[in-house]
Structure formats: structure tokens, C-alpha cells
């Protein structure tokens, strides 16, 4: 009825939905009064007897409107006919009661009050404008000091503070020549008399003249705030409130409970306090009360307004009757439960339901089983409509009755209604876009939703009690989108890496694996069959086994040039199971793809091949059939787990005995003093680690093979049909590591702190653990559980930050026309190709022509999307690196172009305009976050540590090349000792392509020559993994300097062995004499004449410094030759392998935190020398080729990677330590930085076996780089050192250059994802992310305008998002508002327009 009336009496309202931007600002007192419908004078709320609102109170009907629709308070006017009448008795306007949700009131404050947000939200805006400290302003506001507002002719300064006594003395002295005030009045006066323009002029000239960095920072901050006031037209004195707006009463309701009590919003309490104090203050002022009383009342008023706006921001929070702090206006909007995140970004939806899920193996991929009762409830309105249409019910009421009594005809209609009406299923947590998919419902009995087994991977669902929610898309458009974009059968590929996500798992894999295995001498071996049908009949009748090797004629279908099917019959020698499986193979795939035991990886490849060759439809049908077949065979196979399947290897005892003997020997060595305790521990851990691996290997060999007698009566080994082995081998369930604990030995365990306990658990679960062993293993298991809980929360928070930083990145045009790109080559690490070139460039667009290295002809033109065929071509050509387009160098402003992004991984084709690639990138990185560890979570806590490598060998045959800056010296024995810090050795194949690359540590022995031919398996270099040597490059006699026992070195006497070594001690631990603090123990070398040996080509003496912890191995006066070891630095004992691993490492990279103890990079290219040392620091000098000299001070305990006379390049590591991403960006540029972040992030994910496309990380890095710092503003509106959006600078520079003026110069700056999200141009998006108060305060002062470009802002204002189908809507809306009436079909036009026109369209 209400809505009907509203329609009848519709005034011609302007269409309020149409707006282009939202601005936020400060409200002037007049503005507040103009919003108000009356002043609230009394603190009363409701009359407790009549329940009617009190007049002039907080719920007054006269101010805020009637309580009941079209009825005044006293009841004189009722009904519609009096609309708009104002009752002369009670003063209430007769209208809809919902105006009580929008009409505001106000309170006239008896004394002005400072707004706490602008006072206390750091940095204090009031303080910045007035150039006073927060402490001073507070002293004035809370009546502890006077402030001089108008010095007059006196020597006092404006804004000077005077205490009470000062003030009285000055009044004595000057009388009323000057004006000083206390409280907010004083501050308001100062703000009112501040001349913003003049202040800006002064600051600008100060900025020009000053030289100090701190002052520049301070001035430019102040300048920014003042300019914001100047531009937005906001007056500074509005930060002081004279009128307080009152929220409409229905937004702070008062609800009567039974028993005469009321439930009320905290705001009412807060307002009541303000009104009480305000009224009391008014009365005191009228009575001319003593100053001290008035002051106290004013201070209390200030405090009550403070807590109304932001309770608890200053002093103690006001509490209600129940001692909990009251919820103020600021608390209403911030945090997870606040307005933004609770109500605007997360709403509950109608037409939805949830239930437990069960498995539905009989469903097709695009179907789900929906319980009848649920469907009935969800589709109710549709059923009512149908009943009326068919004339079975005349009224809605009648239809409702029919549905509720569930008459038979209702079920028929329900069937009809849901036909072809997709529903959306969602499983929380929705970590990526595949967490919501659409299905066609199939009505089923029972109360559980049935889910297709193949989509479980995408939903991460299992059937142990998971629940899922169902949503019904109502409008035709919504149904269409659900069907075309979200239907499960249209989402075969994972958007994170482009691999199929609809892959069989668990039982299906086991069934397929079993069906395609081969057995020796099983019934039917060697038979011949005419076709598959015959094989099937023979199998069904029990004549042959599935695993029998048979010869059979199979039909294969080739795809013709026109896509027609060409049939050919081929004889295959294969197994019966594979032959039967070949029936469901889609046309176009050769039989060879299934002619092997199908393990999980193989099946994934199979589906991928099918998708690329046969298209989506065939693949979906194929996957469904694979599933049916797999389930059927898994059932028939009857594979189960039995205790006797866990075969403990016979070799185990011997292996353990051998290891124990080795450990004993090490202990001997330790007692005789050959190794230190740390080395002994390391070696013991290594021995046990190796022993565990050997036991596991023996176990897998025994499990994986079994002896059988073949047809000729010989005993042969065949792959075992052991249930446990089959499960692990097929990838259905379990892994080698888990079987190892069942039947091998559990191995080493970690202590709570991550260090490894050196006594391993030598038994396994099959044999059983004793008490001590059980106790050792409990720790790891518990830690695993605790970790999981922490991990989920952390991973979710990372995802949230990632989404927030990228949410506004959408593909908006076809091609930005850039020539820039990224040189991609195969990723080689530790000698292995971790990621081949094909995987890195697949689905990208090449930025330059790809040239055939042999003929120098162009093989692939620039701008081509590299699909599978192209990549094959590149591989066959032997091209080493390809330059591809990347989101990092895309020149589109406020978005990305399709060419720079490349293929949409989830669809397998070029990305469409409107694709929200930012959010997809964030989801792809965040979704596997829960699989990452918080630290290192091992299988049941068993320590997995890379046994320290002691050398490298070639994995493939080829030619040796030395890379990096390889330098080595030959020692007395003729061994080559590496003395370069970043030496690498490369093995190249015959075509000169790099096949593997190994880093060599300083001090390694090189065993090959440059250019030598090596065979696979040849040893290239070796070194001691547990110590790092200090090697001399010159020969001579050792002369110690500053090597004094008890001062710089300590004699360590091993308790066990009684042998002594000299150890360099930390300067902090040296004896207190000041002189000894700064000296460094070092070695100089003397030649035969007793002269100091000089560095070749310079007059610097060779001085080799020992760093802290070195064990000095030479004696004073000893003769040394080139390549000899002077000292050893013991490496850290083996902690379980990780530095910061897992999730924290990913977060650290994306937050762009500078690592502690970061390595130092060379700022310039030049020659290194050392200057005079200062206390605790060493002075490093770099001399550029043109003679410019730069000095750096480096703490002495840092390990230098360079030596006197070495030439370094800009960006090279000088001081050892992890790299600082900010330095990389500054010294080596965007590409190097991106490469660093991508490699580091990928390392973490790769360790967990998670595949993520580099593209996604690049998208995030692009967003981290979206701000720049202005170094020289030129003629633009920017200020030096100001941080601005890159696109804004480019727009402004274009404008300025068009006028022929000087553009601004800027440099890139890297922001962490949290910082980047908060510094986005959109204040709505930033406020809904974090630090709501700070963001809104800043935005209000700047008078910011939100252009509503991103997705989040549009969700918040309740619009379609500018992505996907919404992009077209927004485009047409924009162009209409620009005055052209474009139809929707033109809305896509801008995608083809050249780049320069593009900006006008987005700008409009």
C-alpha cells in the first residue's frame, strides 16, 4: 500500500541516482543549520507513560516528523487527505514516518568546541594550520592557558601561550591593549584571522630558501594542508564547532522492551550529556557565574562533544550503566562491524538458503541437486506467478495456501519454473572467483544439496559436513550472466595458472590408475581383438584381466582442416583397461595420450590437451565420462589399506647400524679436537638425514616392485599392486613422505624453537614408537595444529590487503601502444630449470619480433599473442629469451590494456575489456595462502632440511661457461680457488643455450676450466658446506695486527679436546678500554725483504680483516701462498630450512619492508678503496671513472663483499645481507625490482608446489608503484617531495606541455600494499579499508572528490561495478552525461579508439 501511495503522489523528483563523483568536506555552521529542522533544546527522549516523544527533546516529532504515517502527534489530523498540513496544536507535519530517518536537528552550543578528529587524529590538522604543537592547543582548549589572539601594540606574539599568572601580570602591565582568550574561542579566533593565501606565499618562499631536509618536510606538509583549504574553499574555523548536528532519531532508535525498560542506542546517552552540559552552561552564563565555574562547564562540554564524535580518543572513554564504553559516531563507521564493512560492502541477500552438501556422482558437470523443499521456498514468487497465469489461483493468498499445503500441481509447476533457471552455489570461505559457481538445479528428495565431485577442487569442498549456500539470480540479465560466465562447465581452467581445475582426484584417480596399469602374466595376455567391443565382452565375461597386454584394433579420429572428423583404424598393443578407456576419448586426441598408467599429473595434462585441442564442450563431456569410469573401476578394484601392506625394508637395520657407526666416529673426532661442537652437530644431523632418505628409498623399492613369474616361467619384477603404493604412486592420496613414516623410519624431529634434535626416531608407525620417541614427536604434531589456526587468519588478512590495493585495476582498452616489456628467459636455480621459457611466456604478447637465430628472419611479429603453437615454435627455434609485454610497463592510465596483460588464464583466450584483473591477481595470490606455512610445517613435524650441499655436478652434458664475475686463483697444489663473491658456472648445450646455472660460494674449489666439455654427472666444484673460508690472493709471511688475546680475539680451549684456537670476538664484548673498541684484527703480508705486500697496481698494502666469529687458522710469521686459507667462519648450525618462510615472507615482500640488516648496494659505478675509519664504522670510498668521490660509513661488524681496488657496478652488493627492495628500485629500476619480488614470492609458493602465473604478481607490483615523488615541480601545481598518483602527474604534465611550459620531474617510489591502499585517490575505498578516521579527516580537509573509478567505491554507493558487464553501463552513462546519447552498442566503441582519444572519454 505504502509504495502504491508513494507512486500515486510522486512529485517529479530529479533522478538522484545519477551522479559522477562524491565530494567530502567540512560543514559550515550555516550549512548545519540549513540541514536542521529545528533545535533540540531538552535532553528528554520519550514520555515513559504515553511512549510519545517529548517536545523539543531528542525524539521530538515537531522537529523530526510524525511517529506514525500521516498522523500528527495529538491525533487531530489523521489520514492521507491532510498530507503536508502542520498541526497547529502539536506542530507536527502530517507526512510519512520515514522522514524520521532523514530529518536532522541541531544543538546551538553555548561555547564553541573543537572537533576532536581535527585535533587528535595524527598529524593534528589544527596544529598544522596554526603551526602550534598539539600539547599547546590542548592546553588552550582544556582551559590551562590563555592564547594571545590580538597582540595590539604590545611586544607579545600572536598565538603565544600565557599561564593564568602571566596573563594577570600582562594585564597589569598593558591593560587592555591586547586580547588573550582561553578555550575553543581563542583557537577559533586564531583560525578566523589566519590569512591562508598570505601564509601560503610565505611558506613557498621559505621552501625556496631553506636547505634543511627536516624543514622542507615540515613546510611542505603544512603547505599541502593550507593549499587544500585554499582550493576546496573550506574555512579553517569550521574545524571548531558552533552548532552540533543531531542524527535523525530512527537512526539511533529507542525501543521499549517488556517490563517498562528501554533498549537504546548509545548515541542517545552521548547526546543527552551534551545537551545537559550545554543547557547548564547557558544558565551559568546568564547568571554571570564566576569564571572558574564557567570554565569548568565549558571544559566538560568540550569533553562530552569529544566523546559523542569519537569516544575514547582523548582521556577515558565515557561508559554507560554497564561499565562498557559507549559506541560513538566514529565507532559506528570503523572496523569490521562498522558501517563500511558490515553494511555497505557485505549485505545479506534474499532468495538464498544453505544446507549440508553430499556427493552427486550421477550429475552432469553443469548440474547440482537441489532439495525439493528448498527449491519450493527459493522459487516461491515464480510459482505464485505461474499459478496465477495458469488460472489455478486467483489471488496471491490462494496461491500461498496451495504452495504451503504442497498440492501435487505445485511440484509440476516447480519443475517447470526451475528448468533452465541457474542457481549459484557458494562455499565459504570464498577465496577466489571459483568459490561461487552457477549450476542448473535438479530436484531431489532429502534435505542435502548434491554437488558434482569434479567441482570440489574449485570449492575446496569435501563431504564431511561442509555446508553451502544457494542464491537465485532473479533478473533475466543476472540469469544470463550466471549461465554464460559462471556456469561450472564454463570454468574449466584455474584463473591463477591457466591449468585445468576440473581434475579428477582421490577415488577417480585411483580407479583410472588401476584401469591403465599393466600386469605380467595375467589372464588373457597376448590375445588379439578386432575392436573395443570385443575387449569389453571378454572382460565382462571374466576371460581377460584389465591389466592384460593385448593387441586390439582401435578407431582414432583426426581433425580435418575444416574441423571434420577423419576416422582411421590403428592396431595397438596395449592393455585391456586402456583399450576400454579409449572409447570415451574425444575426437582429435590420439590414443597415445592414455596409453600409459594415468597418474594424477597425467590426467591433468590429458584434460589440458583435450581443452586446447578439442574445445570446451568436448572436454566437459570427457571429464564427466572419466569420472564415471574412474568411480566404477575404483569400486571394482577393491583397493584397501591393510597393515601388512606396509612393508618395512629388510635393509633398514643395516642402514641404521651404519649411521650409528658414522655418528660414533664423528664423536671420536670431536673428542680428539678435529671438529668443533657446532660442526659435529651439523654432521650428525646430516648423517641421520641421509640415513632416513636411504631407508625411505629402500622401502619404496621394496614396496614398488614385486617378483612374478612370466609366461615363459622366468621370475621378473613388475610394478607392485600394493594398495598403499598404488594410492601414493597414482597421486590419489598420501605421499612418499607419509609412507616413509608408516613403513620406513620417522627420522629427525624439530624442537619447539625449530632446531633439530640430533637423535632421530628410528622406528615407524608400523613397528610402533616407544615412550621417548612418542614424546619427541608430539611437539611437531601440536605445532602443526596451532600453526593452521594462525595461518588462516593471517592468510585472510593478506588477501584482504591484496584485494584492496588492486581492486580498481580493470582492463579498459585494447592496446596502449607501448614498446616496453620484460625480457623473459628460463628460470634456472641451483642448476635446475625451475620454470622453462615456454611456461613463462605462454599467454603473453611479445613486445618485439622474435627472430630465428639461424636465418635472422622474423619468426613471430611483435604484438602476437603467444599461444601453445607459437611457444612450440619458439622452443624449436632454440630462442633463449623473448621480450614480452607486461602489466608493469603498460601505459594505460587508470587501468590496463589487453595487450600488456595477455591471455585471460581462466578462459584461455585474450583478456576481454572490463576484466577485473586486479581482483583476480589478488585472489590468485591469496587463495593458496592457507597452504603456505607460517614457518616450516613438516609432515607430522619431521624435519625436512636440505642436506647442506658440498659441491655441484653437471646435470646435463655440454660446454662450461664462467658467468657472474668469476675470479679465481690457483693455490700451491694447483687447485683453483674461487675468490669472487658472485661467481656462477653455466653449462650450455650445443646450440649455446644455457641449460643450467650454478652459484659458487667464495672459497670453492673449481674442478673444470672455462670452455671445457663435460658429461652429465661430472663434478664442477666442491666446498665445505659448514664453514666459510677467508682466502688470501697474495703470498708472503703472515703478520698479525691488533690480534691481541683478551682484547680482539679469545683463545677458545675445547673442554673435551684441550686444543686451543683463536676466535675473533665482538667489539661489544671487548674489555672496556676505549682504545681497543675500534680496532680490527687483521693480517698483513710481508715479502722476502720484510716489506708489506701491496695490491697490484696501487700503493695500498694488502690487509685482510677477520670478521667476528672467525677461527684463525694461521700463526704469526707463517709462510702462506696464493689461495691458502687464513681463517674459517663457521656457518650457522642447521636450523630447519627457512629464514622467514611461507606466508610472513610473502607479506613482507608485498609490504615492501626493508629487511633488518639489509645488504648495501653500490650507489655508483667505480673503484672501491678504504678511507680513515671512525669509531665503530669503516669508511668505504667509491671513485667514479670521472674522478668523483663518494664516501659511505659502514658499521664494522658488517661483512664487506668488496675489497680494495675492486670495480663495482651501480646496484651491486657491497655489504652482505638481504636486498632492500627500495634500494633495488632506486638503483636498478622497475624491471629489476619486479624481477626480485616475483622471484622471491614464487620461491615461497614453489616450495609448496603451488603454481601462480607471474602476471598476477606483476599486477600487484604495478599497484605498489602507482605513486611517485615529485623531485622538481616545474610549472605544475605540485610541491617538491609531494607524493602523487602517477596517472595524475602524467595528465598534468600533458596539460602543461601542451601549453609549452615545464613539466614536473618525478621518481618512482615503492609503497607496501597497506600504504598503497590507504594512499589511493579514492577516499571511500581507503576509508573502508583501514584507519577510517584518519582517512576521512584528511579527505574532509582537502575537500576531496572521489571519482568512483574503482570497484569498491561503486559497491559502496550501490552501483554496478565498472568491470565486466558493468563497464559498458558506466561507459554509456558517462557518455550520456557528456551530452551524447549513446546506445549500449556504442558503449564498447572506446575500446578500439586510439590511445589519445581514450583519455578524453575516461576523463569525461
Swiss-Prot record:
Family annotation (InterPro entries): DNA-dir_RpoC_beta_prime, DNA-dir_RpoC_beta_prime_bact, RNA_pol_asu, RNA_pol_N, RNA_pol_Rpb1_1, RNA_pol_Rpb1_3, RNA_pol_Rpb1_3_sf, RNA_pol_Rpb1_4
Coiled-coil regions listed: none
CDD domains, alphabetized: RNAP_beta'_C (cd02655), RNAP_beta'_N (cd01609)
Enzyme class: transferase
Binding site for Zn(2+) 2: 816, 890, 897, 900
Record keywords: DNA-directed RNA polymerase, Magnesium, Metal-binding, Nucleotidyltransferase, Transcription, Transferase, Zinc
Binding site for Mg(2+): 462, 464, 466
Record-level Gene Ontology MF annotations: DNA binding; DNA-directed RNA polymerase activity; magnesium ion binding; zinc ion binding
Catalytic activity: RNA(n) + a ribonucleoside 5'-triphosphate = RNA(n+1) + diphosphate
Cofactors: Mg(2+); Zn(2+)
NCBIfam families: rpoC_TIGR
The family this protein is said to belong to: Belongs to the RNA polymerase beta' chain family.
The protein's role, per its UniProt record: DNA-dependent RNA polymerase catalyzes the transcription of DNA into RNA using the four ribonucleoside triphosphates as substrates.
Quaternary state and interactors: The RNAP catalytic core consists of 2 alpha, 1 beta, 1 beta' and 1 omega subunit. When a sigma factor is associated with the core the holoenzyme is formed, which can initiate transcription.
Name the record gives this protein: DNA-directed RNA polymerase subunit beta'
Organism for this UniProt entry: Azoarcus sp. (strain BH72)
Amino acid at each position: 500500500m505504502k509504495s502504491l501511495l508513494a507512486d500515486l503522489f510522486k512529485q517529479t523528483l530529479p533522478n538522484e541516482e545519477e551522479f559522477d563523483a562524491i565530494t567530502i568536506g567540512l560543514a559550515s555552521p550555516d550549512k548545519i543549520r540549513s540541514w536542521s529542522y529545528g533545535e533540540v533544546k531538552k535532553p528528554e527522549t520519550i514520555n515513559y507513560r504515553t511512549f510519545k516523544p517529548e517536545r523539543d527533546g531528542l525524539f521530538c516529532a515537531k522537529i523530526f516528523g510524525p511517529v506514525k504515517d500521516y498522523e500528527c502527534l495529538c491525533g487531530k489530523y489523521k489520514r492521507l487527505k491532510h498530507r503536508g498540513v502542520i498541526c497547529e496544536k502539536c506542530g507536527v507535519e502530517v507526512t510519512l514516518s520515514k522522514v524520521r530517518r532523514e530529518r536532522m536537528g541541531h544543538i546551538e552550543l553555548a561555547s564553541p568546541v573543537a572537533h576532536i578528529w581535527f585535533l587528535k587524529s595524527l598529524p593534528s590538522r589544527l596544529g598544522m594550520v596554526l603551526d602550534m604543537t598539539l600539547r599547546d592547543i590542548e592546553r588552550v582548549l582544556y582551559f590551562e592557558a590563555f592564547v594571545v589572539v590580538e597582540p595590539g601594540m604590545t611586544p607579545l606574539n600572536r598565538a603565544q601561550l600565557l599561564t593564568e599568572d602571566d596573563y594577570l601580570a600582562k594585564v597589569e602591565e598593558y591593560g587592555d591593549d591586547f586580547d588573550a582568550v582561553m578555550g575553543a574561542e581563542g583557537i577559533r579566533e586564531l583560525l578566523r584571522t589566519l590569512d591562508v593565501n598570505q601564509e601560503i606565499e610565505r611558506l613557498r618562499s621559505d621552501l625556496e630558501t631553506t636547505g634543511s631536509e627536516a624543514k622542507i618536510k615540515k613546510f611542505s606538509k603544512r603547505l599541502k594542508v593550507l593549499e587544500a583549504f585554499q582550493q576546496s574553499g573550506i574555512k579553517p574555523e569550521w574545524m571548531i564547532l558552533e552548532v552540533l548536528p543531531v542524527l535523525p532519531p530512527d537512526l539511533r532508535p529507542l525501543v521499549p522492551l517488556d517490563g517498562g525498560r528501554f533498549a537504546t542506542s548509545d548515541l542517545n546517552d552521548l547526546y543527552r550529556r551534551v545537551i545537559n552540559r550545554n543547557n547548564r552552561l547557558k544558565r551559568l552564563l546568564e547568571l554571570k557565574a564566576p569564571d572558574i565555574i564557567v570554565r569548568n562547564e565549558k571544559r566538560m562540554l568540550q569533553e562530552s562533544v569529544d566523546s559523542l564524535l569519537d569516544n575514547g580518543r582523548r582521556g577515558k572513554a565515557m561508559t554507560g550503566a554497564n561499565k562498557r564504553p559507549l559506541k560513538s559516531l566514529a565507532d559506528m563507521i570503523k572496523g569490521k562491524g562498522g558501517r563500511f564493512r558490515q553494511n555497505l560492502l557485505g549485505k545479506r541477500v534474499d532468495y538464498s538458503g544453505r544446507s549440508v552438501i553430499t556427493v552427486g556422482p550421477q550429475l552432469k558437470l553443469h548440474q547440482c541437486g537441489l532439495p525439493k523443499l528448498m527449491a519450493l521456498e527459493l522459487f516461491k514468487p515464480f510459482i505464485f506467478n505461474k499459478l496465477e497465469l495458469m488460472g489455478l489461483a486467483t489471488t496471491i493468498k490462494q496461491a500461498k495456501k496451495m504452495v504451503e499445503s504442497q498440492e501435487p500441481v505445485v511440484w509440476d509447476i516447480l519443475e517447470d519454473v526451475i528448468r533452465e533457471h541457474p542457481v549459484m552455489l557458494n562455499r565459504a570461505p570464498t577465496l577466489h572467483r571459483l568459490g561461487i559457481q552457477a549450476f542448473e538445479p535438479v530436484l531431489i528428495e532429502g534435505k542435502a544439496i548434491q554437488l558434482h565431485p569434479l567441482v570440489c577442487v574449485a570449492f575446496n569442498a569435501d563431504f564431511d559436513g561442509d555446508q553451502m549456500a544457494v542464491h537465485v539470480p532473479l533478473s533475466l540479465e543476472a540469469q544470463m550472466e550466471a549461465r554464460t560466465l559462471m556456469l561450472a562447465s564454463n570454468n574449466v581452467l584455474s584463473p591463477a595458472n591457466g591449468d585445468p581445475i576440473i581434475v579428477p582426484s582421490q577415488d577417480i584417480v585411483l580407479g583410472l590408475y588401476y584401469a591403465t596399469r599393466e600386469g605380467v602374466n595375467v589372464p588373457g595376455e597376448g590375445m588379439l581383438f578386432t575392436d573395443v567391443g570385443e575387449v569389453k565382452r571378454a572382460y565382462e565375461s571374466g576371460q581377460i584381466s584389465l591389466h592384460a597386454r593385448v593387441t586390439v584394433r582401435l578407431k582414432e579420429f583426426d581433425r580435418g582442416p575444416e574441423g571434420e572428423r577423419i576416422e582411421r583404424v590403428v592396431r595397438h598393443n596395449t592393455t585391456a583397461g586402456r583399450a576400454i578407456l579409449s572409447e570415451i576419448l574425444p575426437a582429435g586426441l590420439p590414443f597415445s595420450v592414455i596409453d600409459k598408467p594415468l597418474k594424477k599429473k597425467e590426467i591433468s595434462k590429458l584434460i589440458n590437451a583435450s581443452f586446447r585441442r578439442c574445445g570446451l564442450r568436448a572436454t566437459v563431456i570427457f571429464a564427466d565420462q572419466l569420472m564415471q569410469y574412474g568411480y566404477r573401476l575404483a569400486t571394482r578394484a577393491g583397493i584397501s589399506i591393510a597393515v601388512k601392506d606396509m612393508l618395512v625394508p629388510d635393509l633398514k637395520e643395516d642402514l641404521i647400524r651404519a649411521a650409528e657407526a658414522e655418528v660414533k666416529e664423528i664423536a671420536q673426532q670431536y673428542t680428539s679436537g678435529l671438529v668443533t661442537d657446532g660442526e659435529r652437530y651439523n654432521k650428525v644431523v646430516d648423517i641421520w638425514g641421509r640415513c632416513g632418505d636411504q631407508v625411505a628409498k629402500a622401502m619404496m623399492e621394496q614396496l614398488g616392485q614385486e617378483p612374478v613369474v612370466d609366461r615363459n616361467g622366468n621370475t621378473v619384477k613388475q610394478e607392485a599392486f600394493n594398495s598403499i603404493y598404488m594410492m601414493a604412486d597414482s597421486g590419489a592420496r598420501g605421499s612418499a613422505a607419509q609412507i616413509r613414516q608408516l613403513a620406513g623410519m620417522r627420522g629427525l624431529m624439530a624442537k619447539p624453537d625449530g632446531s633439530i634434535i640430533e637423535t632421530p626416531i628410528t622406528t615407524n608407525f608400523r613397528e610402533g614408537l616407544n615412550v621417548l620417541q612418542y614424546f619427541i614427536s608430539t611437539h611437531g604434531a601440536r605445532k602443526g595444529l596451532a600453526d593452521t589456526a594462525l595461518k588462516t587468519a593471517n592468510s585472510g588478512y593478506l588477501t584482504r590487503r591484496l584485494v584492496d590495493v588492486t581492486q580498481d585495476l580493470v582492463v579498459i582498452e585494447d592496446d596502449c601502444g607501448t614498446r616496453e616489456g620484460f625480457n623473459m628467459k628460463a628460470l634456472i636455480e641451483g642448476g635446475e630449470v625451475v620454470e622453462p621459457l615456454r611456461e613463462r611466456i605462454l599467454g603473453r604478447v611479445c613486445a618485439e619480433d622474435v627472430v630465428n637465430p639461424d636465418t635472422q628472419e622474423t619468426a613471430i611479429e611483435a604484438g602476437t599473442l603467444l599461444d601453445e603453437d607459437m611457444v612450440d615454435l619458439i622452443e624449436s627455434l632454440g630462442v633463449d629469451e623473448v621480450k614480452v609485454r607486461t602489466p608493469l610497463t603498460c601505459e594505460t592510465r587508470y587501468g590496463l590494456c589487453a595487450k600488456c596483460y595477455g591471455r585471460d588464464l581462466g578462459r584461455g583466450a585474450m583478456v576481454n575489456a572490463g576484466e577485473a584483473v586486479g581482483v583476480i591477481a589478488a585472489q590468485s595470490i591469496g587463495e593458496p595462502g592457507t597452504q603456505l606455512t607460517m614457518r616450516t610445517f613438516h609432515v607430522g613435524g619431521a624435519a625436512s632440511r636440505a642436506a647442506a650441499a658440498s659441491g655441484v655436478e653437471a646435470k646435463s652434458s655440454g660446454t662450461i661457461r664462467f658467468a657472474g664475475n668469476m675470479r679465481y686463483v690457483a693455490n700451491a697444489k694447483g687447485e683453483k680457488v674461487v675468490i669472487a663473491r658472485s661467481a656462477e658456472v653455466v653449462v650450455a648445450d650445443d646450440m649455446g643455450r644455457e641449460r643450467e646455472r650454478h652459484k659458487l660460494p667464495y672459497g670453492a674449489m673449481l674442478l673444470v676450466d672455462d670452455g671445457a666439455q663435460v658429461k652429465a654427472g661430472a663434478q664442477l666444484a666442491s666446498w665445505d658446506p659448514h664453514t666459510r673460508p677467508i682466502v688470501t690472493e697474495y703470498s708472503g709471511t703472515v703478520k698479525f695486527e691488533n690480534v691481541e688475546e683478551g682484547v680482539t680475539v679469545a683463545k677458545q680451549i675445547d673442554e673435551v679436546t684441550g686444543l686451543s684456537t683463536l676466535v675473533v670476538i665482538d667489539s661489544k664484548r671487548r674489555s672496556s678500554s676505549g682504545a681497543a673498541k675500534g680496532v680490527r684484527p687483521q693480517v698483513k703480508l710481508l715479502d722476502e725483504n720484510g716489506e708489506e705486500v701491496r695490491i697490484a697496481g696501487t700503493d695500498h698494502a694488502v690487509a685482510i680483516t677477520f670478521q667476528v666469529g672467525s677461527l684463525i687458522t694461521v700463526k704469526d710469521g707463517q709462510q702462506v701462498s696464493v689461495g691458502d686459507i687464513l681463517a674459517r667462519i663457521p656457518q650457522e648450525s642447521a636450523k630447519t630450512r627457512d629464514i622467514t618462510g611461507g606466508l610472513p615472507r610473502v607479506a613482507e615482500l608485498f609490504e615492501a619492508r626493508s629487511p633488518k640488516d639489509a645488504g648495501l648496494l653500490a650507489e655508483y659505478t667505480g673503484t672501491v678503496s678504504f678511507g680513515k675509519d671512525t669509531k665503530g664504522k669503516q669508511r668505504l670510498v667509491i671513485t667514479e671513472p670521472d674522478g668523483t668521490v663518494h664516501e659511505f660509513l659502514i658499521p664494522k661488524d658488517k661483512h664487506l663483499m668488496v675489497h680494495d681496488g675492486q670495480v663495482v657496478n651501480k646496484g651491486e652488493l657491497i655489504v652482505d645481507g638481504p636486498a632492500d627492495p627500495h634500494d633495488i628500485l632506486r638503483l636498478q629500476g622497475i624491471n629489476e625490482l619486479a624481477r626480485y619480488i616475483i622471484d622471491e614470492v614464487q620461491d615461497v609458493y614453489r616450495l609448496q608446489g603451488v603454481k601462480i602465473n607471474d602476471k598476477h604478481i606483476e599486477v600487484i607490483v604495478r599497484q605498489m608503484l602507482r605513486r611517485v615523488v615529485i623531485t622538481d615541480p616545474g610549472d605544475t601545481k605540485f610541491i617538491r617531495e609531494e607524493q602523487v598518483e602517477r596517472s595524475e602527474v602524467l595528465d598534468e604534465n600533458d596539460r602543461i606541455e601542451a601549453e609549452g611550459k615545464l613539466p614536473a620531474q618525478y621518481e618512482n617510489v615503492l609503497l607496501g600494499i597497506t600504504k598503497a591502499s590507504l594512499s589511493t585517490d579514492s577516499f571511500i575505498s581507503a576509508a573502508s579499508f583501514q584507519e577510517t578516521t584518519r582517512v576521512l579527516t584528511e579527505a574532509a580537509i582537502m575537500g576531496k572528490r572521489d571519482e568512483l573509478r574503482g570497484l569498491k567505491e561503486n559497491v559502496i554507493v550501490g552501483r554496478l561495478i565498472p568491470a565486466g558487464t558493468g563497464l559498458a553501463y558506466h561507459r554509456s552513462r558517462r557518455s550520456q552525461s557528456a551530452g551524447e546519447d549513446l546506445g549500449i552498442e556504442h558503449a564498447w566503441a572506446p575500446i578500439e579508439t586510439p590511445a589519445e582519444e581514450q583519455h578524453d572519454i575516461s576523463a569525461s
